[in-house]
Amino acid sequence: LKNLKSHFIKISLFLIVALLFSSCSENPSITGYNLLNPLDSLVVKRFDSTNDSAFTYHKELIQKDVLGGTRRILVGKYGDLTASSLIRFIIGLSSEMKDAVKNSNLIVNSARIKLNPVYKFGDTTSNNFNLQVKEIYTYFDEYKFTIDSLKSGRYEIINENIVVRNIDDDTLYYSELKPEKVLNWFKLIAADSSKKLQGVLLEPDDFTNYIRGFASSNAYYVGDPIVLEVVVTYNNKTDSLKYFVDADLHVIEKTSEINFDQTKLVLQSGVKQKAFVFFDISSVPKNAIVNSAYLRLYPDTLESKYGTSYQDSLFVQYITDSTNISIDSAVTFVLTKTSSGYYEGQLNYFVQKWIDNNSNKGLLISIKDPDGGVEKFVFYGTQSAIYSKRPQLIINYTYRK
């Protein structure tokens, strides 16, 4: 047994010495390299779209997404943008109030819509901001309604501003309404008419020159962000009523056309202006293993415009069909602004998928907060005269030669 132990110790010492000798070779290599077939070799390379003269292309597009269920509603005008909002209140009357309305024994003393301002975009030093409120008598679905719906003519919207005056104290915004209009809403409810108020449309007047955001019914807000407050007198008593929101949304009209300028890449929230970007990576070998892949976008700070609060980051999504701009929504990467001023995000998964499946259809880039404001992110485009600031895809990869 002692001899067996002695032989085991000798063999172990021999293996340790051999291992130490091999690791102290004059030509150390990457892990596992010396185990490869001598005819094989691993190559580590970098692809850089701005240095490798790779073909790149981009175009902007607007996808008409619905804008219901957002944390803000937007109203106002600035430049080529006009924002309008639709609100539907839950308005009910007690049996006593219905009888009073039917007997012409109810008076609306005052009525107002209370809003909570949380955002501004445009010429915010101006005091030119006024709301118009118009009645809607056609039901609208906040999860299907778009700017095209508003312009379609299918919705009965009375073209009369029912605002008596607007009161703006920055912390709260009030639109005082014509009492006779609110009384008419009550009459339709009391008569159980098939024609009832379905909501109100909030529009800017002609002199408004900036856009404001108000906390919506979906906002994480203390209290009720939007309230219809009505004071009535009936049966010799006065009552203060509050009606809350059933649905709200905003729509934004952009009057200018998209300028297909390859020197600039423009993204804009509110109107859901996104960008399709393509990089030709055919020079990367088909058997490449992606170690890291980064996308960088360089902002044009003079052309970009931002509101008083916004999310300073972008979404990048994998395109499966470049004709219809269909995406794989399972994975989304984020570009964040670095201390160097450019936006950067890692795209290892996307690039490896391109290589493995020969499926490079491009990327869809959008603003992370697409409906909380109307921020305009302008980046240097794929044909910018400043070559170093063009959209940049960097791929560090390894392949067997």
Language-model features: locations:
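Secreted, disulfide-rich extracellular signaling modules
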Residues: 2-15, 19-401
